[in-house]
Each structure stands twice: as C-alpha cells, then as structure tokens.
Amino acid sequence: MHITKAEARNILSQKRAALTESACMKMDDLLLIQLQRIDWSTTSVLASFYPLANKNEPNTLLFEKYIKTLYPFIRCCYPIVNAEQHQMDFYFETETLQLNAYGIQEPLPFNQVSPNMIDTILVPLLGFDQKGHRVGYGKGYYDRYLAKANKDLQKIGVSYFEPMDNFTDTNEFDVPLSCCITPWNTYAFE
C-alpha cells in the first residue's frame, strides 16, 4: 500500500503520542545498540538535534554521550531555526541554551558551522519509507538544509518505527537518508 507523507505524518504522530515514557526509554536503549554498530571514526563534526519530550522523540542526548565518550574528538552542533526566513543553520553547542519560537532548545548563535564542515547528521523524523525518504513535521527545514549540505554528508535517520511503504508524493526537494536506524534494524539507502 502506498501512502502520502501527510497521511504518514498523521498515522505516525498518533503512534508516537501513544508511546509511554518507559516504552520510549526501552526503544532509546535499543536505538543506542544500533548506533554502536556505526563507524564514527571518520566523523569530526556531528550535527544533531535536541529531542522534544512532548513529542516523544528519540533521546539524542543519550546517543551523543555514548559517541563522545568513545570518540572525544567529535564536536557536536545543533540547529538554530530562523522561522521568518524558513531556514536553519547549525552552531556548535553552548552550555547555555535558548528556546526558539517552536519551544525547541537551541545553542546560542556564536559559532556557526559551515555545511561543508559537517560529516554526519542525525536527522529527526516521524518515520521513513523503504527508499529512505523521511517524513518530518512538515515545515521543510531539514529538506532545505540537506539540499545545500556537503554531498558526502552521512544522513542518519533515527526512528522508533520500521519503514512504511513508499510515499507517493516525494519530489526533487526530498533528500533521502543515507541510512535509518530503528530499535531493531539499520536500513542503508545509498
């Protein structure tokens, strides 16, 4: 069965909202096991995101702690959204955080990271299809950013759910993931 991204967004938002805190914690532990199978030795700058607790997002802070413990040379950066210009850029982490218009934590805008400096990015998503196309919250920030990013960028999706059938409404602006991890599997697309 084929599905549109809007239909997938609706289904996956409901599934995500139904997750309990303990279910999320268990799946985060399983996601961490999958992340441990990835070779991080060629990553020097990792772009990530701060999880939204009210959206039951995967705990990327847990993943980064593991990665930085084993690979202390990796520097992390996080997005700052410019809602007026419908774009985002990444900045190296700061100890002090600020909330943006969407209630998402962001670093202070001091050390912007050029897109060609980022080796690997953890991409937030609600779900993905069998071709590596992601469905997010529908604002398009990541699609626009990934379109201008380094062509060798390793794009890793992090999902609580297995892939859906192929989305019927992908277009040239949809940048597929390199791979996506779920609690039970790692899917490679490139």
Identify the meaning behind each predicted range.
Residues E84-E190:
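Conserved phosphate- and dinucleotide-binding cores of soluble alpha/beta proteins
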